[in-house]
Amino acid sequence: MQVASATPAATVRKAAAGDELSEFFALTPDLLEVANASGNASLQLQDLWWELGLELPDGAAPGHPPGGGGAESTDTEARVRILISAVYWVVCALGLAGNLLVLYLMKSKQGWRKSSINLFVTNLALTDFQFVLTLPFWAVENALDFKWPFGKAMCKIVSMVTSMNMYASVFFLTAMSVARYHSVASALKSHRTRGRGRGDCCGQSLRESCCFSAKVLCGLIWASAALASLPNAIFSTTIRVLGEELCLMHFPDKLLGWDRQFWLGLYHLQKVLLGFLLPLSIISLCYLLLVRFISDRRVVGTTDAVGAAAAPGGGLSTASARRRSKVTKSVTIVVLSFFLCWLPNQALTTWSILIKFNAVPFSQEYFQCQVYAFPVSVCLAHSNSCLNPILYCLVRREFRKALKNLLWRIASPSLTNMRPFTATTKPEPEDHGLQALAPLNAAAEPDLIYYPPGVVVYSGGRYDLLPSSSAY
């Protein structure tokens, strides 16, 4: 029996980065019987599976899962593919609009660009913008039953760009979580130094040092993301399978003494470790430390928004307690949003790793998850790129005000000179009187105030902004 005689088409499942072959599944009841009965058939199917760098499950042959519904299963799978393609286009449109808006607002506001934390926000918007530009390619591929019509060169380019920006996005989210906590600690250290008579130059040098360090860190993040994407640049290629051209990861056999299965499993393992587990650990640690910092600090006795007196003895006022509650909710959103967006896809990828390393057997349940659950997990992971602009920027008052001014200018161009597009921003109304998380004697140093979740605010009008209700 020749493998080419199998009538059902090949099915290729893409992982969250949209760039690698996750599994080549094809199991028909007819060929299942032949594969179990014919040594030659099993050998040829095994050769095809290993040619793709995959492991052929026992008794598997191109088509549908064992006991599958044949044409009914094919129709359901086609509907899923079309739905996933439509979602890709929607995510692409929303991601382009949202991230372009963030980039425009950052470019328009001279004061905002001086902030080290906003440098991370700008780079995050840039990487998400580049990432969603690759989604139309994967949408077309899904709609065409995973056939790749764009050629080998575009396969390599799109695969690497997708992977690099996936890593860069996660790395920048992690860097922002570190920066949020570090800004609080640095501001407190600067305040104590000035308290010893070292002057305002310390605060200025701290700001300049943080800005320079942020630029260096951004460069390192982009370099790390490019390095992590080298396997895509080297091993992404097009291969003809059953007469169809597919874009997939194809590792050489016996590379450095290891077979294709090992390298494909190692490739997936890198994505799980660098793209999920390590960033999640750092993000969770930073925000847990931040919440602990807020809970342990003795806050300046203040008056809340309605004039209620602060708690005596240096304790938290009602307004300060409300502020702490707000930050705690923000941190919860941060961790949960990252966890929920990436967990389903990374869990299925981990399952794939265990199969490739022969830790668990291939099963029909795994096949069904790859066919139906995996595409949904991919969409959920991709949606992160259009959620970031909302969660990081547009929930903040100054960004909403800038957006309102921009829309007003577009709607009334003849009145532009009457209402210029300025960068004036103020803290949220509920933050008045409780925007400082400082030592008890901080009132004597009004030029620098700081409040969670790590935003440094200078009373002279400069703000080191990061939305308190942002995500990641």
From Swiss-Prot:
GO cellular component: membrane; plasma membrane
Gene Ontology MF terms: G protein-coupled peptide receptor activity
Keyword Ligase: no
Ranges in the topological domain labelled Extracellular: 1-81, 141-156, 237-270, 320-332
Membrane topology according to the record: Multi-pass membrane protein
Domain of life according to the entry: Eukaryota
Sites carrying sugar chains: N36, N40
GO biological process, one term: phospholipase C-activating G protein-coupled receptor signaling pathway
PANTHER family: CELL ADHESION MOLECULE, RELAXIN FAMILY PEPTIDE_INSL5 RECEPTOR 4
Family membership: Belongs to the G-protein coupled receptor 1 family.
Function statement: Receptor for RNL3/relaxin-3. Binding of the ligand inhibit cAMP accumulation.
Protein name, entry field: Relaxin-3 receptor 1
Organism: Mus musculus
